[in-house]
Amino acid sequence: MINAERSYWERALYEQEYDLIVVGAGLTGQSVAHFFKKDHPDSRVLIIERGSFPIGASTRNAGFACIGTIGEHLADLEIESEEKVKTRIKERFQGLQLLRSVIGDENMDYIHSGAHEIFTDKKEFEQAAKSIDRFNGWMKDLIGEPVMYSETVYNGHPAIKQTQEGMLHPGKMIHRLIRLNMELGIEYRWNTAVTELNEEHSSVGTATGMKLKAENLVLATNAFTRSLLPGIEIQPGRGFVFVTKPIKNLTWKGTFHFHKGYVYFRNIGNDR
């Protein structure tokens, strides 16, 4: 590694103070930077990412755009208040509308496919089906959709169809957001691992010894947060995404949910 002393010009360019530094270039971090810059056009905003591209969950998921199934809502109501569950549903819906307006459906291959919640247990299906009218009433009040859920059958399985769901390409979504942010004048530092966070002096230190200061710091590193803030009790949960080999005459098309939303699957193209 070359440890050459920086020139006057380099120091003027790279060692100045920012109005906002965001650590983590996933969807959350880039969105924070995006809206901060739009609200403060003259501000200097920097996003720091340890990889050559975002390496967290933002681009390592199944590409669902959903606000929840009846099975999921019922499971949530067993451990949370009705008010909290309703708030989350409304915020999910509003967040998806905002995402689509910022990114553009065509820029992330968004398909408004609707969805099906699949059941293999008769009692679970009957319990969920009894709640259709209840949750349709919720959706009318929360998102203006009076008939979101309906009873049906899919590929021989009892199911509940829902209208407000879609699928998208997470990689294209993030790529588009990067382009938009660069057009706004937001700076990026790729392959830059932040190893130190100084809240008192509002600065971060990198693995290469660089110190960067900002009036505002945002840590948007999700599962990696404990490496910078070991005192915070964050335990990441591991999820798995499996991509099948090509399947001839694939009949499962759309987005599907199973087991109270803990298992979900979708098609990719016509044969996966």
Which ranges hold each PLM region?
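Glycine-rich FAD pyrophosphate-binding loop
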Residues: 37-60
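Active-site substrate-recognition segment that forms the wall
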Residues: 40, 50, 63, 106-111, ...
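Flavin (FAD/FMN) cofactor-binding and adjacent substrate-gating region
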Residues: 71-77, 101-179, 184
